[in-house]
Amino acid sequence: MPVRGIRRRYLAIKIYSENVVKEKDLFNAIENKINFLYGVVGASRIGYRPIWFENGIAIIRCNHLWVPQIRAVISHIQEINGIPVMVQVIRISGTIKTLKKKLKNE
C-alpha cells in the first residue's frame, strides 16, 4: 500500500501595526515563537516555510496536521523588534494559487 506524502497547508496572515514591519522581521518572529513554544523537534514537524509577503499580508506553509499549532504561534506574536503588532490568520488553503485568488477577491 503506497504511503501518501506530507500534505501542506498555506496560511494567509495579516499584520496590523502602526509602523511598517519588514518581511524578514516577521518571518524571524514566527520562527522564534515556534522554537519557544514547541522546541526544535516541534519546529521540524510543523514544516514552517515563509512563502510570500506584500502590503502587510504574508503567506506561510506548514504541515496539515500542525495547522492548529501554527495558528496558536501566530496568535502569540504581540511585538516584532519592539513594535507592537497584532497578527491574524485570515485564510487557509491547500494551494498557493487558490489562496492568492481568494485574497484577490476580498
For the regions a protein language model found, what residue spans apply to each?
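Arginine/glycine-rich "motif VI" loop of SF2 helicases in the C-terminal RecA-like domain
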Residues: 78-83
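Helix N-cap motif at beta-to-alpha junctions
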Residues: 61-68
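RNA-recognition motif
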Residues: 47-54
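Intrinsically disordered, low-complexity polar/charged tails and linkers
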Residues: 1-37, 45, 84-106
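Short, conserved catalytic or adaptor-binding loops enriched in Gly and charged residues
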Residues: 41
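Short amphipathic alpha-helices in soluble, non-transmembrane regions
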Residues: 30, 70-77
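A short beta-strand motif that forms part of the nucleic acid-binding face
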Residues: 64, 74, 93
